[in-house]
Swiss-Prot record:
Subunit structure: Homodimer.
Protein name: Methionine--tRNA ligase
Compartment(s) of residence: Cytoplasm
Cofactor: how and how many bound: Binds 1 zinc ion per subunit.
Residue interval(s) of motif 'KMSKS' region: 333-337
PANTHER family in UniProt: METHIONINE--TRNA LIGASE, METHIONINE--TRNA LIGASE, CYTOPLASMIC
Role summary: Is required not only for elongation of protein synthesis but also for the initiation of all mRNA translation through initiator tRNA(fMet) aminoacylation.
Amino acid sequence: MTQVAKKILVTCALPYANGSIHLGHMLEHIQADVWVRYQRMRGHEVNFICADDAHGTPIMLKAQQLGITPEQMIGEMSQEHQTDFAGFDISYDNYHSTHSDENRELSELIYTRLKENGFIKNRTISQLYDPEKGMFLPDRFVKGTCPKCKSPDQYGDNCEVCGATYSPTELIDPKSVVSGATPVMRDSEHFFFDLPSFSEMLQAWTRSGALQEQVANKMQEWFESGLQQWDISRDAPYFGFEIPNAPGKYFYVWLDAPIGYMGSFKNLCDKRGDTTSFDEYWKKDSSAELYHFIGKDIVYFHSLFWPAMLEGSNFRKPTNLFVHGYVTVNGAKMSKSRGTFIKASTWLNHFDADSLRYYYTAKLSSRIDDIDLNLEDFVQRVNADIVNKVVNLASRNAGFISKRFDGVLAAELADPALYKTFTDAAESIGEAWDSREFGKAIREIMALADVANRYVDEQAPWVVAKQEGRDADLQAICTMGLNMFRVLMTWLKPVLPQLAARAEAFLNSELSWDAIQQPLLAHKVNPFKALYNRIEMKQVEALVEASKEEVKATAAPVTGPLADDPIQETITFDDFAKVDLRVALIENAEFVEGSDKLLRLTLDLGGEKRNVFSGIRSAYPDPQPLIGRLTVMVANLAPRKMRFGISEGMVMAAGPGGKDIFLLSPDDGAKPGQQVK
């Protein structure tokens, strides 16, 4: 089916320029790259761009810590990021920075248009100020309890638990991330973008049917709670662009960050000497398609602020947002202590890029679901699918063609009907790639790989090769096998660019989507070389260990209690739920004859008495003051027979030992027998 060539601009969210790329980042860039490569194979004009998000207080402060300028730090980080993405074969047409002339000009242009159109409001606000550091505190440099869902340890601009946005002054019990001080309030004039003016437009955009259902539903919640004016300014000191005609005021990073998509594309057009494409892609009535691949944590900014800014400054809105979930490793959040917080560069020291690209692709869909990188399953799936099914199909047939027929394929297929079954699947597989139902595409491809391998099993070319007068049959069977391999690799080319390049070299033919309608016949292939090696669990073990060592090498020396007594390995919630902690009243406390370490405690659990031996005598040489205190005990610990009697539980205490042991006590109001949760 002939497709009309489309003009498409694709972006990934801009990585922040103060840290390395890790496997969580790579999910998005791989997802977008697979989609882009498929679109290019179908003949569409695709511009794939990204940039580093290079502004904000975190970058300014980190550069100060490193003793370098912010410009030097973001320059070094940009090179590192680009090296990582190139290592994973992310096929960007341009990778730029938000700290650029193009981005400054476009940010000022959009701001000026918004201001001229009446969408920028000025007002004086009370703002949190760090009295120790002498600076206003940006959103991300205040932490406290979310005013909406009451989750602790949340940043000052939005809650990572419930997704709500708010001002830093709304936080409960705020603390400065910079110094730990309790901030004070000071007045400052700020500039606000009038987001509520765009509510009707945004709701119509939401109802257009283009957005993912989960995104549209979340946006509807925000509409129902009411849109608020958005503070787009920050006070000096700040690393970013100064607002025109407003000395000491800077654009908030989230204003100029998405404009970085435009800046990167403008930079690409200028490199090409192209004076028309920028306007063609970004003008109000553009027929080009614009897609943003983003994580679910930044939907608010991309679905509300960004399209409203574009609308208010007379630019086009995105065609769609493609939102994905988070990455977990072995069923849990990535962990530095467990070695599962894995940098992209570390991965490439132990595995090739294709392996991770394949595993992520096999698990992705168009929904906003989290993806678990189970490292054991990863090894099994890569070996089972890529090695045993796809590559094995080529290796089982290539040797006979090379040795017996000088590398020349037969003039006819052994089973044209079977080959048509393969080519007929192109439409459904293509639709799966196009709609980002990547897992579905992989399942269809692997099902056909099974069909191809069954064909080879049934035809048994190794048997035919030993039978006289059957050379033509042997050549036709192996030609059929290699043509099915060619079709499979064509479909997998967007996912496995390195393997696809090796397959093209072997087949002596480019893997083209439309070309599979014509099989390779009477065609000379090159001598077969191993296309892909099996991977092993020992590589995973080395990867995890290397990640742990990297953390040790870069982490600040740990001092205090954690240095002497590190946190234990993570347990599951089910494991924790087995421990029954109860409030207990100490009815009696006395020395244990024959022991200089133990005290015998008689505990009341609110109707049940327990006898507990506890090694706290060194900290409590006079046990009498303990009588009448409340403490916490493990109530379901199996009784333990000791030389002095049976201990029926364990009381909870902290400290390194000796005189520094501190028996835990609940707050006033707790009662014996109550469960500690």
